[in-house]
Swiss-Prot record:
This is Procollagen galactosyltransferase 1. N-glycosylated. Its EC number is 2.4.1.50. GO terms for biological process: positive regulation of collagen fibril organization. The keyword Protease does not apply. A motif (Prevents secretion from ER) lies at residues 614-617. Its main location: endoplasmic reticulum. Glycans are attached at N91, N179, N376. One of its GO terms (cellular component) is endoplasmic reticulum lumen. Beta-galactosyltransferase that transfers beta-galactose to hydroxylysine residues of type I collagen. By acting on collagen glycosylation, facilitates the formation of collagen triple helix. Also involved in the biosynthesis of collagen type IV. Coiled coil: none annotated. Keywords: Endoplasmic reticulum, Glycoprotein, Glycosyltransferase, Signal, Transferase. The lineage of its organism: Eukaryota, Metazoa, Chordata, Craniata, Vertebrata.
Length: 617
């Protein structure tokens, strides 16, 4: 027998075995004997979730709410639906029935609890009034849904108000991953309102705390212990403590206000179950609650406004493909024309604005904006354009930019069309704006008041930045929501009369051009720079402003996604001089500064719609 090589004699066996690759490789063990062979275990099935929906007079919201629900990334065969509706005066029941018939084969199970009669509660003052009998009925329905989830051995139950839009398709899995007994996704709204409280009084009422706003604005991110979550929240039924949670009947020790969300918060407290709200991501949106005297029209428009707010920074909500949405009929709101200015290369803005106007049933004429960046010096000279002598941007000391030149010409061309077509009153939109709630109705009401009073007007700002903030502007007598405009920036949206357009064209502004939002205050003699005003006469434009405003910018300086086509370009007559200051520090597009009490337009007559939407927490 040959001898082993020198140095290898007597090596231990174990280290040599450790150097060998595993027999089974990554797929498992391929043992010598059959009983030694194995395969890795399959993953766990997705948890069983019951989604509970309660609907009353919700027809306008259903296509969007159900469409968003359909987008949730949770296996439908592991999802059950529990749906109840009653006390309706619209076709909520019919829409829900149509949807459930279409989707029942896709989900694990469907429980349908409709009640066609009665259409109102005996002690309610209107469809938005929450009476004691309504609270009690809703609590009984929530308890019935909770019992159904327990009876079917569901792992979780998701309660979701029918006007809540869950736009993040991963919301369910994200909440489940938090491993909390009761957890809610923080929902966004147009105001400070959301679906959680940070403080509660000893009587169970809302209490303002310093912790709320940083969470609501996402200055602090995470999952936070709070005394109240409502509207949309998830309960982990696997947790032993969840067995002690109830919506109805109320706890024997309960003495607080008879309110479904407070009753459930008390139940959690007694069961020693902590509620949590998570704001790590944008999960969805909800409307600000309306007052008890509000109408179903108010509610429909409020929900539609939620859809508009979603589109400001997110893709539009996809409507359910299983139900037919009502056809919209657009009009011009009583104006002779509605213009919408858009740069051809800004397709995203154009699509968002056209969709926003369509949602509000507003018909518009699309106006292709003049792209100042594409104009060369010879084109500018051929049009006889000259900058106003001595003009300098008030913040950067620079001359006019090509972007501002294009913006001015875009508005100028509309004024020309107004005169050429003899349009008595027109509405002009830019494409980077967001609408306030009840926009269409409030503006139409205002214009009716203006006509009824026979007001002599040329231009009415619908959206602007007020620059004179030392004292209040003069309220217009007998006309609600209107003031005489002082020095203002921005041309986001305005109403212009034929007479107003004629005055602006008669000033021959192309030969002494300055930015359009500086030119307008010059023409109504409110610009603080006398040297600018000296080049124009007469300065008799009759200018007013809506108060409160109905239009605001989609983005301000410093916001994610903020882009300026006016200030971020080149100097009007020198393509080598760039003006890229605006991205970081433009003062012009900063949000309106807070007004002192003395400077607020507090004397303006208010309309009922101003107080319909409740901004309080």
């Amino acid at each position: 027998m040959a001898a082993l090589p020198r140095g290898s004699r007597g090596l231990p066996l174990l280290p040599l075995l450790l150097l060998l690759p595993p027999l089974g490789g990554p797929r498992g063990a391929d043992g010598y004997f059959p009983e030694e062979r194995w395969s890795p275990e399959s993953p766990l099935q997705a948890p069983r979730v019951l989604i509970a929906l309660l609907a009353r007079n919700a027809a306008p919201a259903l296509p969007a709410t159900l469409g968003a629900l359909e987008q949730l990334r949770h296996p439908r065969e592991r999802t059950a639906l529990w749906v109840a509706t009653d006390h309706n005066t619209d076709n909520t029941s019919a829409i829900l029935r149509e949807w459930l018939v279409a989707v029942k084969g896709l989900y694990h199970s469907v429980e349908w609890r409709p009640a066609e009669e009665p259409s109102s509660y005996p002690d309610e003052e209107g469809p938005k009034h929450w009476s004691d009998s309504r609270y009690e009925h809703v609590m009984k329905l929530r308890q019935a849904a909770l019992k159904s989830a327990r009876d079917m051995w569901a792992d979780y139950i998701l309660f979701m108000d029918i006007d809540n839009l869950i736009t993040n398709p991963d919301t369910l899995s994200l909440l489940i991953a938090e491993n909390k007994t009761v957890v809610a996704p923080m929902l966004d709204s147009r105001a400070a309102y959301s679906n959680f409280w940070c403080g509660m009084t000893s009587q169970g009422y809302y209490k303002r705390t310093p912790a709320y706003i940083p969470i609501r604005k996402r200055d602090r991110r995470g999952c936070f212990a709070v005394p109240m979550v409502h509207s949309t929240f998830l309960i982990d039924l696997r947790k032993a403590a969840s067995r002690n949670l109830a919506f109805y009947p109320t706890h024997p020790d309960y003495t607080w206000s008879f309110d479904d969300i407070i009753v459930f918060a008390f139940s959690c407290k007694q069961a020693e179950v902590q509620m949590y709200v998570c704001n790590k991501e944008v999960y969805g949106f909800l409307p600000v609650p309306l007052r008890a005297h509000s109408s179903l029209q108010d509610e429909a428009e409020s929900f539609m406004h939620v859809q508009l707010e979603v589109m400001v920074k997110h893709p539009p909500v996809q409507l359910s493909r299983f139900i037919s949405a009502p056809r919209k009929t657009s009009d011009k709101m009583g104006f002779d024309e509605v213009f919408m200015i858009n740069l051809k290369r800004r397709r995203d803005r154009r699509e968002r604005m056209l969709r926003a106007l369509h949602e509000q049933e507003i018909d518009c004429q699309l106006v292709e904006a003049v792209d100042g960046k594409a104009m060369n010096t010879s084109q500018v000279e051929a049009m006889g354009i000259q900058m106003l002598p001595g003009y300098r941007d008030p913040y950067h000391g620079r001359p006019l930019t090509k972007g501002e030149l294009g913006c001015f010409l875009s508005h100028y061309n509309i004024w020309k069309e107004v005169v050429d077509r003899g349009l008595q009153k027109s509405l002009v939109f830019e494409d980077d704006l967001r609408f306030e709630i009840f926009f269409k109705r409030r503006l139409m009401n205002l214009m009716r008041d203006v006509e009824r009073e026979g007001l002599d007007w040329d231009l009415i700002y619908v959206g602007r930045k007020r620059m004179q903030v030392e004292h209040p502007e003069k309220a217009v007598p007998h006309v609600r929501n209107l003031v005489e405009a002082d020095y203002s920036y921005w041309t986001l949206a305005y109403v212009i009369s034929l007479q107003g357009a004629q005055k602006l064209l008669a000033a021959k502004p192309l030969a002494k051009m300055l930015p359009v939002d500086e030119f307008l205050p010059v023409m109504f003699d409110k610009h603080p720079m006398s040297e600018y005003k000296s080049h124009f006469s007469p300065r008799n434009l009759r200018a007013f402003s809506v108060e409160p405003l109905l239009i605001y910018p989609t983005h301000y300086t410093g916001d994610d996604g903020y882009v300026s086509d006016t200030e971020t370009s080149v100097v009007w007559n020198n393509e080598q001089v760039k003006t890229d200051w605006d991205r970081a520090k433009s003062q012009k597009m900063r949000e309106q500064q807070a007004l002192s009490r003395e400077a607020k337009n507090s004397d303006v007559l208010q309309s009922p719609l101003d107080s319909t939407a409740r901004d309080e927490l």
